[in-house]
Amino acid sequence: MTNWQQQLPLTDTQKNELDKSVLRYLNWNYKQTVRHEHAQDYESVRHAIVTLSGFLLQESVDRQEFISNNDTSNESMVDIDELLLPKKWNSIVRLQKKIIELEQNTETLVSQIKDLNTQVSELAQFKPTTSNGTSAHNVLKWIPRNLPSCLINVESSVTSVKLHPNLPIVFVATDHGKLYAFDLFNYTIPLASLQSHTKAITSMDVLFTNYTNSSKKNYLVIVTASKDLQIHVFKWVSEECKFQQIRSLLGHEHIVSAVKIWQKNNDVHIASCSRDQTVKIWDFHNGWSLKTFQPHSQWVRSIDVLGDYIISGSHDTTLRLTHWPSGNGLSVGTGHEFPIEKVKFIHFIEDSPEIRFRTPSTDRYKNWGMQYCVSASRDRTIKIWEIPLPTLMAHRAPIPNPTDSNFRCVLTLKGHLSWVRDISIRGQYLFSCADDKSVRCWDLNTGQCLHVWEKLHTGFVNCLDLDVDFDSNVTPRQMMVTGGLDCKSNVFMR
């Protein structure tokens, strides 16, 4: 055996078949081009193919195929595939692409397995106390894995997302004014969809009522705000999987930026803020506007409610605390350099003395029911503030503390590279999303960024949601959902 035969990774039979395939392709190409376009070269090309076959092919039977007249009517040529070589070539390219895709999928699955093994190790350290076998402490310490469990696509950019408090359903609002409900275990098509507004939905909130009066049936309420200056209130009919509109709230004179719905005893109220610089309080049951006040000199971007108090963030870069039943402004926070996109109260949670900001530092704050709040801004920072105690008087509305009416910034979180759009707090973690296309998880105890999800969306990340940890009517689940400008919503589940 010669040296070149040793280098060739083919048996004699395989080499013979390869040579025949090459000659057949040359023969086919000669018949298609030379015979019709270069007739003068017909004989010379055909002679070259015959000569080459005699050189490459040892068996006379194999050579006879090319010595014959190459007529397609020849019976010996009927079962011969002259294009076998280019077909194999194309198949190899497709297989290489498929192999690359499979390798990428394998890397993804290996990463998910590692994340799951880590979660199993963490679960083994805690005693199960919940119905699903997971300790409540561990649920609040959950950090989503690197890749989402499912991906939901809609027709336009996602402006707001909310998880159903009890069921595996996510509600998605879009820039085209559409409202969707998706089953997280079968998300190929929505459970329900509704053109709820004529312009973009800017905000959404949900509440599962908890009436103590047995004559009233509890159900899920969904409130949406829009650029069409309207607020719509819907009931989610679980039996029929549909949105049932209850009423519309009209009164704002410009874009409605945000809405919140909450229940105190058997009373349900809705708060809204607008570019008309006002905040309005509405009675859910009759739709009446109970209170209107103007806490800022510019566009009010965001609000949050805790009992009788509302915190608001504005285009004027400040956040303010207001006692909404009286309309009294109590305190103000200054420190952001650009408009504030989101504000939230930090609720106290029981039996968590090791978590910073989640327990009151004094009995006065404990009796008041709040102490800290958080704001996210276009200046790329997230700030946590201590709220000064107002002057509280029996049977009278609170008034500003004459000696201390300014928020005190106790922690600033830096890491985002663009506007911070939304925030959510669970346990000792704060989750944030921004226009830098990333989602971040921060440790409230240390102020450090623990994890960054950088490739969830191809555009701005507009919103996110997790189950709250302070409502006894809501069992926190290990779930997180995000929505972005790329018309996608990512869902993370344990």
UniProtKB/Swiss-Prot annotation:
Q: Which SUPFAM superfamilies does the entry link to?
A: Lissencephaly-1 protein (Lis-1, PAF-AH alpha) N-terminal domain, WD40 repeat-like
For this UniProt entry, which residues form the secretion signal? none
Q: Sorted alphabetically, which keywords does the UniProt record give?
A: Cell cycle, Cell division, Coiled coil, Cytoplasm, Cytoskeleton, Microtubule, Mitosis, Nucleus, Repeat, Transport, WD repeat
Report one GO cellular component: nuclear envelope
Q: Which GO terms are recorded in the biological process aspect for this UniProt protein?
A: cell division; establishment of mitotic spindle orientation; microtubule organizing center organization; microtubule sliding; nuclear migration; nuclear migration along microtubule; vesicle transport along microtubule
Identify the InterPro entries for this entry.
Answer: Dynein_regulator_LIS1, G-protein_beta_WD-40_rep, LIS1_N, WD40/YVTN_repeat-like_dom_sf, WD40_repeat_CS, WD40_repeat_dom_sf, WD40_rpt
Identify the main location: cytoplasm
Q: From what superkingdom does this record's organism come?
A: Eukaryota
Where, per UniProt, does this protein localize?
Cytoplasm, Cytoskeleton; Cytoplasm, Cytoskeleton, Spindle pole; Nucleus
Instruction: Report quaternary structure and partners.
Output: Self-associates. Interacts with NDL1. May form a complex with dynein.
Boundaries of each LisH domain copy?
14-46
Q: What does this protein do?
A: Positively regulates the activity of the minus-end directed microtubule motor protein dynein. Plays a central role in positioning the mitotic spindle at the bud neck during cell division. Targets cytoplasmic dynein to microtubule plus ends, thereby promoting dynein-mediated microtubule sliding along the bud cortex and consequently the movement of the mitotic spindle to the bud neck. Following plus end binding, dynein may be offloaded to the cortex by NUM1. Required for viability in the absence of the kinesin-related microtubule-dependent motor protein CIN8.
**UniProt remark on domains:** Dimerization mediated by the LisH domain may be required to activate dynein.
Q: Which residues form a coiled coil?
A: 90-123
Keyword hit for Cell division:
yes
UniProt-listed PANTHER family: F-BOX AND WD REPEAT DOMAIN CONTAINING 7, WD40 REPEAT PROTEIN
By sequence similarity, the record places it as follows: Belongs to the WD repeat LIS1/nudF family.
- Could you tell me which species this protein originates from? Saccharomyces cerevisiae (strain ATCC 204508 / S288c)
Describe where the WD repeats fall, as residue ranges on this chain: 153-192, 196-244, 251-292, 295-334, 347-395, 415-454, 457-492
Instruction: Identify the HAMAP family for this entry.
Output: lis1
This chain's protein is named Nuclear distribution protein PAC1
Lineage here is: Eukaryota, Fungi, Dikarya, Ascomycota, Saccharomycotina
Gene Ontology molecular function? dynein complex binding; identical protein binding; microtubule plus-end binding
